[in-house]
Amino acid sequence: MTNEESATPKISVLMTCYNAASTIEESVRSVIAQTFTNWELVLVDDLSDDDSMDLIEKLGDTRIKIKKLPTRHRRTKALNQGFRLCLGEYIAVLDADDIAHPTRFEKQVRLLDTEPSLVGVGTWFTNIDEHGRELSRCEFSSGPTAIKRSLASNSRLVHSSMMYRRESAEVFHGYDEKFDYAQDFALWLSLSRLGELSVIPEQLTKLRRLTDSMTLGKDYSMSMVSDGYVLYRRAQGLEGLRVIDRLKGMRTIGLYGLLYAWRSLRAGNVVRAIGLVITNFWAIPLAVIELLRKSLKSFNSVK
């Protein structure tokens, strides 16, 4: 049986959208262009007030299922609305401003089909600007051991590049709604308790870096640091980490803790800020070094 002949989709592509008219058509067309064709696209519109959905409806592809939310849900709840509609054995994620290489799904399905120990697989990725121009490429050690070690201090798994087993994610009821920003990282930590995570060492995903992207907005700045602080502390409980992995993780926790304290102070939460500084006081020298390193890098870039 070819992948076109199955009545039930092998893959559910999960995409959420909020006012993405400038990018969503290109993203959806990259799904339509996949060499693996047995998929459904579950597209959750989080109360957009532009013509995003009109653009997609005009494509006329019956594999696209649009769920229009009656009220604004924000990112994590919108993802779960879509997650509950997914029928595929595997769920592939693609944001409404990102692009999948034509062979991405085919290669991820092949790996998950042949490696039952894997619960999820991502890809290397290229960062692009709003016009599609390449900004940088991200390539890194990609085997299960390297990925688990990176989860402790510097997760390299990008949500929009991932494909994971739906049944495995259902154990945790999808995405943890306590996390507004890093709901994907929370899921990877949960899935790692059930099996291995890996990455295909090929450039199969393009991530669009937009200055007005939802996850870069001011509303998410506090969630970004609070989620990171909580989740990297949780990552210390991963099995199989080396001492060096845990030490790197503690460094990350300390830096996130101080940044969380600063953001809390600016938001007027003095009590929380003081508590975070006391807890992470030991990381202040690390923060100073990090600031100096970034300043030197910035200085060298303009020389």
PLM feature segments, named:
Residues 1-32:
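N-proximal low-complexity "stem/linker" segments adjacent to membrane-targeting elements
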Residues 2-5, 185-186, 209-303:
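C-terminal subregions of glycosyltransferases and related glycan-biosynthesis enzymes
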Residues 22-25, 50-58, 99, 103:
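Acidic helix N-cap motif at the loop->helix transition within catalytic regions
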Residues 30, 37, 45-54, 71, ...:
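A conserved acidic beta->alpha catalytic loop
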Residues 69-86, 107:
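Glycine-rich, basic loop-to-helix element that forms the pyrophosphate-binding segment
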Residues 84, 101, 123, 137, ...:
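Conserved nucleotide-sugar donor-binding catalytic segment
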Residues 91:
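Short aromatic/hydrophobic "clamp" motif used to bind/position activated sugar donors
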Residues 103-135:
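Conserved donor NDP-sugar-binding/catalytic core segment of glycosyltransferases
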